[in-house]
């Protein structure tokens, strides 16, 4: 695995391209995190769109720069809309990202996520329990929470990345980003990131948006993880708890200067 400094150098370079492109990111995400996800993308410089109706989702996925599928509040009708959007993205060669929330805990979403894998996501982002379940190596997880350390799921992530030919992100105290051949580790962040709802889901949206960038997908996705870790650290330094952390986190993303962060670490 390559060191953190390598990722930070990449992250500074990638952030400039991200803000210049402002990827139009079609987010089919869960009801709990819609606003936070949209605000996270906006703060970084992307352009979010929350189009969820089946009639609109299919054509919109074809014109977006990237698509996120997050199954956190999956229903049968929403699954139909998501499948239509993914099929459209696949045909249009729009990169799409899967966030398999609680995939090991509930059979309906497990079958749905496994079915979508045939349509070749550009990236998959999940916690250790979710990646282990999606790879078929284990089932479980406490709802949306992980019962495993990120490193424990790294072999499963690497195997899944090779099988699907995509980037897999396992998040935790240290994030691991792999294409099955190369793996990058991204430490950082702050425990307060786990005390609010939506940081993982928002990261998946940023990962999706980063997949729209030119260049190596592994480096772009690792950069996305680095941005979120750096913003989490910065926000925690000026927060008193979860309530003040959320606006501080959005401000930190908006003002993020990776080059300056590199110089002070």
From Swiss-Prot:
Q: Where does ATP bind?
A: 125, 171
Give the matching Pfam families: HK
Superkingdom of source: Bacteria
Listed GO biological process terms: thiamine biosynthetic process; thiamine diphosphate biosynthetic process
Q: Which cofactor does it need?
A: Mg(2+)
Mind giving the lineage of the organism this protein is from? Answer: Bacteria, Pseudomonadati, Pseudomonadota, Gammaproteobacteria, Enterobacterales
Q: Does the keyword Kinase apply?
A: yes
Its annotated pathway reads: Cofactor biosynthesis; thiamine diphosphate biosynthesis; 4-methyl-5-(2-phosphoethyl)-thiazole from 5-(2-hydroxyethyl)-4-methylthiazole: step 1/1
Q: Which GO terms describe its molecular function?
A: ATP binding; hydroxyethylthiazole kinase activity; magnesium ion binding
Give the main EC class: transferase
Function of the protein: Catalyzes the phosphorylation of the hydroxyl group of 4-methyl-5-beta-hydroxyethylthiazole (THZ).
UniProt entry tagged with the keyword Metal-binding: yes
**Official protein name in the record:** Hydroxyethylthiazole kinase
Keywords, sorted A to Z: ATP-binding, Kinase, Magnesium, Metal-binding, Nucleotide-binding, Thiamine biosynthesis, Transferase
Q: What is its EC number?
A: 2.7.1.50
User: Which residues are listed for substrate binding in this entry?
Assistant: 50, 198
Residues in the signal sequence: none
